[in-house]
């Protein structure tokens, strides 16, 4: 090659470089149980042409790093708060909904208990009314039984009286007077009941007979006065 030395670019130099290139080490598929060696930290070495960093610049770079870390921490905290905020709101809403459901259930149970209490009070009032009706019916039955017992006692006394005086009562109407004849029979027997002077005969009383122009003359006898 132009511009190069023969010793550097010749075949001898190429053979040297070929000899310097060694084959790569064989790859071990099994991992070693020992931990890997720590990676060495590279510290920038100042070159002879560069001057060493000043302490003010180092403090400024450290403050900038701290500011960046603080900003990252604030961003992470705000993200966590933003993630936890909706969850907390949903939890509060769920708690409020659960309380509302519990209150509605308690109100429904209270209404059911109140309805049952009213029903029980109505049933008790009806039972009391029926009890009063039954008492009134029992009193009526007692009065009727008493009246029936009195009637039965009267009937028994009447039967005893009839049994004791039945023969006399049967003989009594035969010995008594005959009944008053009716008006037609009286008129057929002489019209004694139609004339005013004949009414006294049909009367039961013993009052004086009325005056009659056709009065019969008394029978003549030794005691009767002569005309």
From Swiss-Prot:
Residues 1-72, 200-227 are annotated as: Disordered. One of its GO terms (molecular function) is DNA binding. Ubiquitinated, leading to its degradation by the proteasome. One of its GO terms (cellular component) is euchromatin. GO terms for biological process: cerebellar cortex morphogenesis; neural precursor cell proliferation; regulation of cell cycle; regulation of cell population proliferation. Keywords: Cell cycle, Developmental protein, DNA-binding, Neurogenesis, Nucleus, Transcription, Transcription regulation, Ubl conjugation. Residues 22-55 have a biased composition (Pro residues). It is found in: Nucleus. Interacts with TMF1; may regulate TRNP1 proteasomal degradation. DNA-binding factor that regulates the expression of a subset of genes and plays a key role in tangential, radial, and lateral expansion of the brain neocortex. Regulates neural stem cells proliferation and the production of intermediate neural progenitors and basal radial glial cells affecting the process of cerebral cortex gyrification. May control the proliferation rate of cells by regulating their progression through key cell-cycle transition points. This is TMF-regulated nuclear protein 1. The gene is TRNP1.
């Amino acid at each position: 090659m132009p511009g190069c030395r023969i010793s550097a670019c010749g075949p001898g130099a190429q053979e040297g470089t070929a000899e310097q290139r060694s084959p790569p080490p064989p790859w071990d598929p099994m991992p070693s149980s020992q931990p890997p060696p720590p990676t060495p930290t590279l510290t920038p070495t100042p070159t002879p042409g560069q001057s060493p960093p000043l302490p003010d610049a180092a403090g400024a770079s450290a403050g900038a790093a701290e500011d960046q870390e603080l900003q990252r921490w604030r961003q992470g905290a705000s993200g966590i708060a933003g993630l936890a905020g909706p969850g907390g709101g949903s939890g509060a809403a769920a708690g409020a909904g659960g309380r509302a459901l519990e209150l509605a259930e308690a109100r429904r149970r209270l209404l059911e208990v109140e309805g049952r209490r009213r029903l029980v009070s109505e049933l008790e009032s009806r039972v009391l009314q029926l009890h009063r009706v039954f008492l009134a019916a029992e009193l009526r039955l007692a009065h009727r039984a008493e009246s029936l017992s009195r009637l039965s006692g009267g009937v028994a006394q009447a039967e005893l009286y009839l049994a004791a005086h039945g023969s006399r009562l049967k003989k009594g109407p035969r010995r008594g007077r005959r009944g008053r004849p009716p008006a037609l029979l009286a008129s057929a027997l002489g019209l004694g009941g139609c004339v005013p002077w004949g009414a006294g005969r049909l009367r039961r009383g013993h009052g004086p007979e009325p005056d009659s122009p056709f009065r019969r003359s008394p029978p003549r006898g030794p005691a009767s006065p002569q005309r």
